[in-house]
Amino acid sequence: MANHKSALKRVRQTKKRTERNRFYRTRMKNIIKDVKEAVASGNKAAAIEALKVANKRIHEYVSKGIIKKNNAARKVSKLHKLVNSMNEAA
């Protein structure tokens, strides 16, 4: 265990940040799952609405430093591709 005062503070900060990041990452996974479920159900309006929410949240998490910009772009692109595949299938 850390002995210096600054090292103890760093341990506390790391725990706090890890917990916060875990919360947002879990939330992001659930939002992505909502989009995939809406696409699977075939409800185009619900899929588009879920995509809007996901897009907003994912970019919000970039500004919070939870994920990196390219990671977010990749996730959003994948979701857009998925929702757009509904248009082609219909």
Swiss-Prot record:
Record key words, sorted: Ribonucleoprotein, Ribosomal protein, RNA-binding, rRNA-binding
Highest taxon of source: Bacteria
InterPro entries: Ribosomal_bS20, Ribosomal_bS20_sf
Disulphide connectivity of cysteines: none
One CC-aspect GO term: small ribosomal subunit
Chain intervals for the UniProt region annotation (Disordered): 1-21
A GO molecular-function annotation: structural constituent of ribosome
Example GO BP: translation
PANTHER family per record: 30S RIBOSOMAL PROTEIN S20, SMALL RIBOSOMAL SUBUNIT PROTEIN BS20C
Family under the similarity heading: Belongs to the bacterial ribosomal protein bS20 family.
Role, per record: Binds directly to 16S ribosomal RNA.
Protein name: Small ribosomal subunit protein bS20
Species annotation: Nitratiruptor sp. (strain SB155-2)
Gene that produces this protein: rpsT
